[in-house]
Amino acid sequence: MATIVASKEFTGNPRRQLAKLFDVSLKLTVPDEPNVEPLIEPGKFGDYQCNNAMGLWSLIKGKGTQFRGPPAVGQALIQSLPTSEMVESCSIAGPGFVNVVLSSKWMAKSIENMLVDGIDTWAPTLSVKRAVVDFSSPNIAKEMHVGHLRSTIIGDTLARMLEYSKVEVLRRNHVGDWGTQFGMLIEFLFEKFPDTESVTETAIGDLQVFYRESKLKFDLNPEFKEKAQQAVVRLQGGDPVYRQAWAKICEISRNEFAKVYKRLRIELEEKGESFYNPYIANVIEELSSKGLVEESKGARVIFIEGFKIPLIVVKSDGGFNYASTDLTALWYRLNEEKAEWIIYVTDVGQQQHFDMFFKAARKAGWLPDDDKTYPRVSHVGFGLVLGDDNKRFRTRAAEVVRLADLLDEAKDRSKAALIERGKDKEWSPEELDQIAEAVGYGALKYADLKTNRITGYTFSFDQMLNDKGDTAVYLLYAHARICSIIRKSGKDIDELKKTGKIALDHAAERALGLHLLQFAETVEEACTTLLPNVLCKYLYYLSEEFTKFYSNCQVNGSAEETSRLLLCEATAIVMRKCFHLLGITPVYKL
């Protein structure tokens, strides 16, 4: 059998490289079953295992096969496996599992190559080229609150992971900047500030209060309500005075959002509901021409199989709604932005809405019938942020928690903990401030991202700022400690990278090396499943593997110092890339 040299296509991705080897083996072992995909998983009794034997046996046992059972199929897979520098040995376990042990020399060489060529050479390659991630999406004239936290940071992490995996990502902020509520806001603005051109953020003050006061007047004052309804008509009709007032409210709101995004290091391009207005009528017309739109109780609707209530696309008063805007946005993203994968990050409560409008899009022929081919749509639903009482997280006054206040408190608590440890005497005020911010915001993000997004989680500053266990604080400490070990060696790590060699002779060295090499497949899994907690789990276990390595293997002053310093550096690099993908700023000293 010819030797297959490790493929550069999947550098630093043993799982993918093994899949290529076993793909050859499968085609040689069972040439009559050409569509069988290699099933490669991390192994219980080896580094990896191939799980095809049992499935293959069930396919071929009635077809006059030479094999006598799954173990014989597994043995044949081993015999047909091309020789490769990455594989040390293979063996059969149980009912035909093929256990694979990687070559320690190959593992060491792969890590050395990453240290020279950079962590980006380990980035997975996905089959999709361009994706839209629709996330955050607050409503104009309302402040961002704790409910926006999850969409904002989950969406940002998904975008970062896809970008790292060589996907062009269009980060979209689908803000609520249109609708009947603007009539009441504009009319209230006119009453308070007859000269709207001179209105500033300072003059309006707290937008949340402004919104509440206008809503109260709308509910209690019939004359004001009528004016507000007329204002909506004028705004939608393009009246320049009303358009200007609307633009002013949007601008003030946008500036408030920008402050939060800057603090969280979130990049977004706004394409709000109003952006799609010019396209809605044509999209509804296209859906009507395909026979999808029907009249029902004065409204125009699409009936969706499996749902009792239809999807309303034109209200009985002739106005448009969320469904009309969302369908139009999807049409635009597919036809104008040429996106192959459109990902919506919202709470799980909106699941039915997405199910219905995705089915409507399939009915229209915009999307394929299955979820495996492109273009594809995905709803990334997430659970609630809960308080100690297991109910929706609120302030003591039963108010929604403002996101800006939450960020302030995270930073303040982080700073207080650092001062308690005397860091204000060691560091400059600027350093203290920067590190407090990195730790505080990092703790907030990680506590959210480490939870499977589908479930809710209980918000607790005490828990998330704990320096022990699965927290950002613990992980940032671990990274800072690795940096300290390298600094204390007195060696130029960049020079060592060029000439030094890694040996994975000790069991703890090898375990750490294997975990480092599982980084690319972890990012790929987190991207394809749209689950950031997969990456968080990897990062936490990486810090645990490093702790075991450091407890068992002396680094500085040992005979293996160069190799072990390079392992420290590789761990720090992978940790930093994980932090980057999670939107967390690493710290180099704590």
From Swiss-Prot:
Residues 470-484 are annotated as: Interaction with tRNA. One of its GO terms (molecular function) is arginine-tRNA ligase activity. A motif ('HIGH' region) lies at residues 138-149. Its main location: cytoplasm. InterPro entries: aa-tRNA-synth_I_CS, Arg-tRNA-ligase, Arg-tRNA-synth_N, Arg-tRNA-synth_N_sf, ArgRS_core, DALR_anticod-bd, Rossmann-like_a/b/a_fold, tRNAsynth_Ia_anticodon-bd. Disulfide bonds: none annotated. PROSITE patterns: AA_TRNA_LIGASE_I. It holds the Pfam family Arg_tRNA_synt_N. SUPFAM superfamilies: Anticodon-binding domain of a subclass of class I aminoacyl-tRNA synthetases (SSF47323), Arginyl-tRNA synthetase (ArgRS), N-terminal 'additional' domain (SSF55190), Nucleotidylyl transferase (SSF52374). The keyword Isomerase does not apply. Disruption phenotype: No visible phenotype under normal growth conditions. Belongs to the class-I aminoacyl-tRNA synthetase family. NCBIfam families: argS. This is Arginine--tRNA ligase, cytoplasmic. It comes from Arabidopsis thaliana (Mouse-ear cress).
